[in-house]
Every structure is written in structure tokens, then in C-alpha cells.
Amino acid sequence: DQKGQVKRVFGGDIPMERPVINFFDRETTDVELKQRLALKALDFLEKDQLVAIDGSSTNLQFAKNIPNGLKLTVLTNSYSIAHACSMKDQVDVIVLGGRLLKESMTNVGETAASQAALYHPDLCFMGVYAIHPEYGMTIPYPDEVSIKRQLIQSSRRVIALVNPIKLNTVSRYHVCGIEAFTTLITDNDVSGEMAVDYRNKGLDFL
């Protein structure tokens, strides 16, 4: 429409596609917001857990805020997150292999996905580019689909730290339905009406 809120498609309207932004630009934007989301997410961590942390700029802030004395094993496909976790005395780090996707600085593809299938994390903190109650989670790069799906499938609980600008948006490639998530963590100023749309799909919306 004239406001750029939706794009017209056959059979109806869907939300405007999110623009593609590379990791390094995302890493330096909305840092305070990402830190607030990260601090909320720390409440889910417990000693001796196996925690999968998918690559994203918000998840990087989460990794940086893991308490130094908390004993964990972190499984990740992100070099930035692996480096942040390596600075924690009690955190062991497992890095999944694969092809480096420079736009997200993550290892992707079938090699990464097949390695991820060997693990069953207690928690998965999934990187989210666009999420919508009807269209689920979508991403701009097709090579990320298999690793994200595998981490979701293998994990007991899937949590997403989501900048409010990503809510009710879509990108190019479908990863999963909204029901794949157990918890969605976002900022406190998200409207109650929007939260209801996600809670109606069975998510804890924090």
C-alpha cells in the first residue's frame, strides 16, 4: 500500500519483506535493546546445560552476558558467539563446521546441519530475522535453512530473542512455523494485541 506496510500478492496481502542487512551492520545497531533482551534470557540458563546458540547479533549480546562462573557447554555455528563464549572460564564451546556464510558470519549448509544432528541441546536460542504468527520464521539466505531447522528439531526448548521491528514481518525462505518455538522474548513496549497473536499459537511471550 501507500505506506509501504504490506506488499500485494495473489490471494491477499502479506507483510512487507524485511530488508537484507549484513551481520556487521546489525551488530552495531540497537545494542542497548539487544542487551535488555539478553538479560531477560539469562534466567533460562542452568548449570551443566548443553545450550545451542544460533548466529545472530542479538544472540551475540546474550553470549557476552553469560555469567563467567556458570558451567555450560555451548554449541554454535557462529564464530563471533564462539569467541564470546571462549572468554568465559566455565563455558566449553563446540563449533559446528560447514561453509561460512559471510553475510551472517555463520557456518551453514548440510555439513553444519549433519553435525548439529549429533546433539540434543537442553535449550536453543534461535537467531530470528523475520517472524510472523501466520507465516512463521523466514530468513533471507537459503543456505541457513537446514542448520536452523536441525537445531530447532534437536532441541528440547527453543527460545527466540526478537527485536520488535522483526515481529509480523517476512523474508524470503521459510524455516518453520511459529509453533516450533516455546518462548519468544521481546521488548516490554510491544502492544498487548500483538502479543495475543503469538500466545494464541502456544508461545510464552515475554
Question: At which residue positions do the language-model features occur?
Answer:
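Conserved donor sugar-nucleotide recognition element shared by glycan-biosynthetic enzymes
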Residues: 34, 55, 78
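Short amphipathic alpha-helical segment that frequently serves as the phosphate-/nucleotide-binding helix
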Residues: 60, 79, 141
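Conserved phosphate- and dinucleotide-binding cores of soluble alpha/beta proteins
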Residues: 8, 82-206
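Gly/Ser/Thr-rich loops at beta-strand to alpha-helix junctions
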Residues: 57-59, 191
